[in-house]
Amino acid sequence: MPLFAKAEFMFRLNFKTGIVTTSKNSAENYYMIGLADDKYDYKNYLLFQRPIKLGRYEDADAPHNGLYAECNGDICYNGCKAVKITSELIVFEVQDSVIDMDIHGVKIPKRFIQYCKEIFGDLLSIEG
């Protein structure tokens, strides 16, 4: 079953994060954060993107102008319900799934929290 598919039960994915990346691509107009279990030989990964700024004539309610999520090849738009970051863990609630990512000991880019705030807005809570 795809991770972002609707289901009557909650799907849970847990993995140890090996790398965290961030980017702000002004030319392509997006903020992005990415987390994976390995830099090159990854089995599990998660990406989130949001436009930096919408153009004057772009529809803010169009799905492709919202929050893009991709996990292990499955994609959804605007399905993220909540994100919680602690010193040891990041928990994403996406549609009917929960993704727990152990970040203990992982180098976190200095812009990670800033970009998370831009991407997730009010969905984000930070503890510690």
Where are these regions (language model features)?
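Mixed-charge, glycine-accented linear interaction segment located at domain edges/termini
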Residues: T86, Q95-G128
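An extracellular/secretory-lumen and virion-surface interaction module
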Residues: P2-A5, I19-N25, G55-P63, I90-V94
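Ser/Thr- (and often Asn-) enriched beta-sheet segments in non-cytosolic proteins
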Residues: R12-N14, I19, K84, L89-E93, ...
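Broad, structure-driven detector of short, well-ordered beta-strand segments within folded domains
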Residues: D41-I52, F92
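Generic detection of short hydrophobic beta-strand segments and adjacent strand-loop junctions
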Residues: E8-L13, F48-I52, I99-D102
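Short, internal acidic amphipathic alpha-helical interface segments
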Residues: I52-L89
